[in-house]
Regions:
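Surface-exposed beta-strand edges and their flanking turn/coil or helix-capping segments
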Residues: 21-24, 35, 55-57, 68-70, ...
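Short amphipathic alpha-helical segments
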Residues: 15-41, 72-76
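Glycine-rich beta-strand-turn "strand-cap" elements at beta-sheet edges
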Residues: 1-3, 36-52, 75-95
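Short, well-ordered beta-strand segments in beta-rich or mixed alpha/beta enzyme
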Residues: 5-12, 41-71
Length: 95
């Protein structure tokens, strides 16, 4: 079994946060996340830049990247600027 990874993504949107969040919170997005065992933990908007979004997910290692590869075109139709996407990944290491 692969380890669980918490991924933090930031990116720009070309719509309002409310418009983007309605899509992110939709049944269609839930279905697409579920196919890759992705659990969204948080999504928010920058206080300084209303076009900058943060999303925190938890999923088996590599699944979020597979999701983005498989759904990049779908994401772009929702006015996500994929060229601005930045990611950091975090995991729990037992001592």
């Amino acid at each position: 079994m692969s380890s669980l990874v918490t991924s933090i993504f930031t990116f720009k949107i070309e719509s309002t946060f409310e418009e983007w969040a309605a899509i992110f919170d939709s049944a269609e997005a839930y279905k697409r996340h579920s196919e890759f065992l992705i659990k969204p933990l948080f999504r928010g908007v920058s206080k300084k830049d209303p076009q900058k979004v943060i999303v925190i997910h938890q999923a088996p290692e590599g699944n979020v990247q597979k999701f983005v590869e498989a759904n990049g075109d779908w994401m772009a139709t929702h006015r996500v600027d994929l060229s601005t996407m930045e990611e950091s990944s975090w995991t729990y290491a037992e001592s």
